[in-house]
Amino acid sequence: MTTITLPPPNARYQFSILPEIFKQGLPDTDADTFDYAKENFGLIPRAYPSDGTMEDVESKTPWQRFEHYVKTLNGNAEEGTEYKVLYLGRHGQGYHNVAESRYGTKLWDDYWARQEGDEHAHWADAHLTEIGEQQARDVNTFWRTALADAKVPAPETYYTSPFYRCLQTASLSFSSLDLPADRPFVPVVKELLRETNGVHTCDRRGASSIIRKDFPMYVLEKGLPETDVSWTPDRRETPVEHILREHVLLEQVFAEDEHEFISFTAHSGTIAAVLGAVGHRRFALPTGGVIPIVVKGEKLIR
């Protein structure tokens, strides 16, 4: 069990989850069997305090009423308080996931994760398998229906981990969608969204020049070095360190991004750390899984 006191002493923000919005946040929802695509993304059917201020509310979908609620919360929020909806997506199956299943987690952690690959595949900065590509296309299919029918708000900003499997997943998930003109798919590559750092070669970033070459429409955040200077072969980031790293990421997003609906394409460990940073219950995602959350950010006075 990871024990951590949040916010950390040097924090600029305190984060919390807006409860009773999504089924994934309820204690009796089983992450192993829950299918977000069959459950309206997990949105709990309910009335909102803002329903009375919405024109033609009876004709609106639950997601349209929820979107109005979020905008109302932000419109009435005290100075320094803001609400953001985060769509947290895990990459599709990568070659490293297949290798861990082949060898078992203990042998993977003890030996194979430190190697570049085996006779079956190369997994340093792992790419998606064919199954992983299809999982990402399944996310695209979900979004296509969700946008058109349920009226789920499209992300206004897209952030992705710099690892190749996430760059692929983001592209396959979003690039072919009929998105609103003011919400184009122009993802920003953020280093802080990387997987738990160190030791595992699958979690060592490839060259930034490869990202520019293979994903020319992606925007690399300022200062991303050509090579992965933070990865080390002999020390793995701890769960507490990872939660603190994602707390910094959230501080950046809340301080610098004015948008309310934001997509993160990342990793199992990273999403777990984001959930930990905002006080959400543990909710493990399968490869290709997505979970929405509403985060309340309160700026701290130091």
Give the location of each predicted region.
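Active-site-proximal alpha-helix that buttresses catalytic centers in soluble enzyme cores
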Residues: 2-185, 189, 212, 239-246
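Short, solvent-exposed loop/turn segments at secondary-structure junctions
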Residues: 92-95, 163-166, 193-195, 229, ...
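Short aromatic-enriched loop/helix-cap "lid" or pocket-rim segments at secondary-structure transitions
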Residues: 97-102, 199-203, 277
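Histidine/lysine/aspartate-rich catalytic loop segments that bind and position anionic ligands
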Residues: 188-198, 204-235
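Regulatory modules of eukaryotic transcription factors, especially in plants
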Residues: 232-240, 271
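A short, acidic, amphipathic alpha-helical segment used as a generic capping/interface helix at domain edges
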Residues: 242-258
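C-terminal transmembrane module of eukaryotic multi-pass membrane proteins
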Residues: 253, 257-267, 273-275, 281
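Domain-level recognition of soluble alpha/beta enzyme cores
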Residues: 279-302
